[in-house]
Amino acid sequence: MSDSQHFSRYEKARIIGARALQVAYGAPVLVDTDQTEPILIAAEEYDADALPFTVRREGT
């Protein structure tokens, strides 16, 4: 995710939720953290801009 991207709250929720599911199923964690809950790990990764997700918007 680049700094120039601004996500709506719905996009942010979808990104964090998708990443939390990946972490819950054993995907490697992309940041150093003491958290054990997948949703909290995903939120930390989102805040650290460590997620390799791309949002495609139709019509833009």
UniProtKB/Swiss-Prot annotation:
The keyword Cytoplasm applies. It is found in: Cytoplasm. GO terms for biological process: transcription by RNA polymerase I; transcription by RNA polymerase II; tRNA transcription by RNA polymerase III. One of its GO terms (cellular component) is DNA-directed RNA polymerase complex. Keywords: Cytoplasm, DNA-directed RNA polymerase, Nucleotidyltransferase, Transcription, Transferase. It is an enzyme of class 2 (transferase). It comes from the Archaea. Its EC number is 2.7.7.6. GO terms for molecular function: DNA binding; DNA-directed RNA polymerase activity. It catalyses: RNA(n) + a ribonucleoside 5'-triphosphate = RNA(n+1) + diphosphate. PROSITE patterns: RNA_POL_K_14KD. Transmembrane segments: none annotated. Part of the RNA polymerase complex. NCBIfam families: PRK01099.1-3. Belongs to the archaeal Rpo6/eukaryotic RPB6 RNA polymerase subunit family. HAMAP family: RNApol_arch_Rpo6. DNA-dependent RNA polymerase (RNAP) catalyzes the transcription of DNA into RNA using the four ribonucleoside triphosphates as substrates. This is DNA-directed RNA polymerase subunit Rpo6.
